[in-house]
């Protein structure tokens, strides 16, 4: 029987975390927990209820009454209550404002508690900004993905074009730099590499190369 370890994958926006985490989870038959989708779902809740993204108390009060859940599938489905929000939380409106919502300490604390519950049984791959440092500090394998701003903007540009969104590469670079600044400098659970995390620069690597590297590291932990 496969040892059910916890794998934490952190890194900045568009570093390839979610794509790689899904592949790793599928290969290991682990559960994938998309914490970014949880923050996006909370941002969507604020938008839907006309609550300002800066209104921490208002959003926190709504979150207390809201169930966010995942359902497996070829593409993992995300639900807010009974509403499937898988597509809408990837909209540009949500993408451009999620860092504001994610910077609120009470929101991070509430979601971190939920994320820790997901991980109690092990056998999970969780990606985000503070998984290895705050959510799962005892994860058996911690990965920190990096890539240049130019490469990340290019990836996001291709993603947007594939979804039919008009794209401006220079604007995307600017947005990613702004998102990095917010993520790295926020007071509560900023984006940073855990001391025991393994850094992987994905700038010149394919998705499969990154996934295979993490799988090799995971196999060492599982078989140890």
Swiss-Prot record:
One GO term (biological process): nucleobase-containing small molecule interconversion
Domain of life: Bacteria
UniProt binding sites for ATP: 11-19
Pfam families registered for this protein in UniProt: Cytidylate_kin
Reaction(s) catalysed by this chain's protein: CMP + ATP = CDP + ADP; dCMP + ATP = dCDP + ADP
Main location: cytoplasm
Any single GO CC term annotated in Swiss-Prot or TrEMBL for this entry: cytosol
One MF term in the entry's GO annotations: CMP kinase activity
Keywords tagged on the record: ATP-binding, Cytoplasm, Kinase, Nucleotide-binding, Transferase
CDD domains, per the entry: CMPK (cd02020)
EC number: 2.7.4.25
Subcellular location: Cytoplasm
Gene3D superfamilies associated with the record: P-loop containing nucleotide triphosphate hydrolases
Similarity remark: Belongs to the cytidylate kinase family. Type 1 subfamily.
PANTHER family, per the entry: CYTIDYLATE KINASE, CYTIDYLATE KINASE/PANTOATE-BETA-ALANINE LIGASE
Stated name of the protein: Cytidylate kinase
Organism: Listeria monocytogenes serotype 4a (strain HCC23)
Gene: cmk
């Amino acid at each position: 029987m496969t040892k059910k370890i916890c794998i934490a994958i952190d890194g900045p926006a568009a570093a390839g975390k979610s794509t790689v985490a899904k592949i790793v989870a599928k290969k290991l038959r682990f559960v994938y927990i998309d914490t970014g989708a949880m923050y996006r779902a909370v941002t969507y809740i604020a938008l839907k209820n006309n609550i300002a993204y800066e209104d921490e108390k208002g959003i926190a009060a709504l979150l207390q009454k809201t169930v966010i859940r995942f359902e497996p599938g070829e593409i993992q489905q995300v639900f807010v209550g009974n509403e499937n929000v898988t597509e809408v939380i990837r909209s540009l409106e949500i993408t451009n404002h999620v860092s504001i919502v994610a910077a609120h300490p009470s929101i991070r604390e509430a979601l971190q508690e939920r994320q820790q519950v997901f991980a109690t049984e092990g056998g999970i791959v969780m990606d985000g900004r503070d998984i290895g440092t705050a959510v799962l500090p005892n994860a058996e394998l911690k990965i920190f993905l990096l890539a240049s701003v130019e490469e990340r903007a290019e990836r996001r540009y291709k993603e947007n074009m594939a979804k039919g969104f008009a794209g401006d590469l220079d604007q995307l670079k600017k947005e990613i730099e702004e998102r990095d600044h917010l993520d790295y400098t926020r007071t509560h659970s900023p984006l940073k590499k855990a001391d025991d995390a393994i850094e992987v620069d994905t700038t010149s690597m394919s998705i499969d190369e990154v996934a295979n590297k993490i799988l090799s590291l995971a196999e060492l932990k599982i078989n140890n």
